[in-house]
């Protein structure tokens, strides 16, 4: 029931029933798809979406009418973008965890701590404006349209989000992550001379993929929100971001069932918040790989 509620909520908020069902399934465990919950997840997600639509709720939907043609220069930018978004997700998770631990350790009365955190947010709002409060849908839509935004907008939203979560220790993280991804994508597109709208859409889903370990759901989310033209590029970037973000997650109760790197040995089968990762040297021996491949063929 909890899973169905999660899938339904995602579908209602973002207007993405397929991605909602897959997101709820992927969020349970990293590296495993539980097929026995596919049907209830999809039923809950699709039903919630249809009910919301019947009630007249409008969703964030902006199909991209211009996507750069596939060529070598764009593909290299795409690879670099995926690494940038994964690195950003990695840093964001670590910063939220450390700031939460720090504020928890400060021996201050909790209501007073909330008052101080709220005062800090008000001060930042007076300096930088209200764009970084709330959902920020207008700014996200502007990024995807190719409008100019502050190059450090994603850092400001990250700061607002970190302060809020570290003080309150609760609150939505998905929409702020999407905001950070869209503005970071716009910044990356401008930095590399690429189309800012396209990379805003790619960053929108890629940072979420890295921060929550959900590359399949976020690839589908790109199709449902931005159209099929961006699908192959978004999928590549989401997978790279997923690999680059390491064995971390905004959802610390995710169960890790795979290692993302041959050079790391995490404790598999444990929740991410409880694992310890050990580095190991990676030796690539071509002859050993060829012998393993040949022995595998001879067994068939």
Task: Show which residues each predicted segment covers.
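Alpha-helical transmembrane segments and immediately membrane-proximal extracytoplasmic
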Residues: 1-300
